[in-house]
Amino acid sequence: MKVIFLKDVKGKGKKGEVKNVPDGYANNFLLKQGLAAEATNSSMKTLEAQKRKEEKDAAAELENAKELKETLEKLTVELKAKSGEGGRLFGSITSKQIVDAMQKSHKIKLDKRKFEMDDAIRALGYTNVTVKLHPQVTATVKVHVSEQ
């Protein structure tokens, strides 16, 4: 019997795949558990439409990420912090503080986990911070830390 997997089934198939499985296994396990649906013409058309929609959504997401990259590359995020001698900060600037500053000054909301910082910023001046917007799109944001 031909079935369309609705969920991943270990050793049999992944979600969205169409496979031939034994009738008994399909009727007694896959269909009853809601792990698969019978592959009829209408369900195949639905699956194709769903795949096209997912591709379209992924393309739109990539386009949005590219537009956001263009915006971020032009920005400079201004932060103020207390510092000691030699431009060393008392404390550090974290990705959370950068996100908050971007939200306040530029009305851009990002997740702090998207910032790829090896370590927090601990010195005055300009620092380039990498932001992973999408698996294929990364942007660089300039962060300017000045003395308070």
Curated annotation (Swiss-Prot):
Show the PROSITE patterns listed in the entry.
RIBOSOMAL_L9
Under Gene3D superfamilies, the record lists:
Ribosomal protein L9, C-terminal domain (3.10.430.100), Ribosomal protein L9, N-terminal domain (3.40.5.10)
Which InterPro entries does this entry report, sorted A to Z?
Answer: Ribosomal_bL9, Ribosomal_bL9/RNase_H1_N, Ribosomal_bL9_bac/chp, Ribosomal_bL9_C, Ribosomal_bL9_C_sf, Ribosomal_bL9_N, Ribosomal_bL9_N_sf
List, in alphabetical order, the Gene Ontology terms for molecular function in this entry: rRNA binding; structural constituent of ribosome
- Report the record's Gene Ontology biological process terms: translation
Statement: the UniProt record of this protein carries the keyword rRNA-binding: yes
Q: Which UniProt keywords apply?
A: Ribonucleoprotein, Ribosomal protein, RNA-binding, rRNA-binding
Top-rank taxon, per record: Bacteria
Q: Which GO terms describe its cellular component?
A: ribonucleoprotein complex; ribosome
Its function, per the record, reads:
Binds to the 23S rRNA.
Name the family: Belongs to the bacterial ribosomal protein bL9 family.
Q: Which NCBIfam families match?
A: L9
Q: What is this protein called?
A: Large ribosomal subunit protein bL9
> What organism is the protein native to?
Bacillus cereus (strain B4264)
Lineage, please?
Bacteria, Bacillati, Bacillota, Bacilli, Bacillales
Gene giving rise to this polypeptide: rplI
